């Protein structure tokens, strides 16, 4: 049982491998799934049976939803990819917040700032040891606009980063959320050493974003390459400390971070503001969303205690092989369509 998070109404969300499942594609094991229970440990309920691969770190949102990282290895995707989703505490209204589309990409570790924006981390899933770059986004798009840009990368806005060679190299990805922007553009989430900064010193990478009062952001930052491989070098090794990013960023250099604690004898991580929820979010607790009663009153065909049912149609209207095009290395349809092969 991992990652407990306090919800409104005396509930606690957490992840657990108690079902003993293994991910369909392996690589990330075991399968952790989302559960909610009362704060005294009673009424344990699995709320996300769609977590057949894995889920991590539920985080309460002020509007009552739960933010969490979801292992996204479906279909033809790379087995290391994680996205960030939201769900109601009773398991309804599961929806994407930001999805991964680059090989080895993990959107993981998230928090909600005082103004309602969310900060997520992007890192390469393996050699970066959880260190990468931060991105900020609103939970709702501007009025009258869709939440996400196009499925085609070239129709998406450029996102700032600085690559290991030390120069800016913005990237694009499909379905970029509206308002998605870098708040640590001085570094990169990629599988390479952090960029060289002033005086030939590598600028390092960040991890573990956590909201603080007044719109500030706590984080862990390490100088150096923050990558295990010789790309071009792995040393000096990690020396993580706790820092504060004023106003939730952006910052264009690690020198703009405010040092809180960095003992060279230790790696400090997982900062948390030890304050009341109101001090960060302006309310005493998140909205308490209604719980699906499941008491037999919704429909005669659904008696009390009816098991969850999942309905999925995305593979029909937005499948990975668009009509008339199949990725060259995965063309196994012999001239037929993916649904009549």
Question: Where in the sequence are the language-model features?
Answer:
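Surface beta-strand/loop "capping" patches
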Residues: 203, 276-340
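Conserved beta-propeller blade repeats
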Residues: 1-11, 52-67, 102-117, 156-161, ...
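Residue position within the beta-strands of beta-propeller blades
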Residues: 12-17, 66-71, 117-122, 217-221, ...
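Carbohydrate-active catalytic/glycan-binding domains of CAZyme proteins
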Residues: 72, 91, 110-115, 122, ...
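A flexible loop/linker signature enriched in serine peptidases of the S9 family
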Residues: 1-2, 8, 15-34, 48-55, ...
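Surface-exposed loop and turn segments in beta-propeller and other repeat-based domains
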Residues: 1, 44-45, 94, 98-102, ...
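Blade-level signature of beta-propeller repeat domains, shared across WD40, Kelch, NHL, RCC1
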Residues: 236, 240-243, 248-289
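Extracellular low-complexity, Gly/Ser/Thr-rich intrinsically disordered linkers
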Residues: 200-249
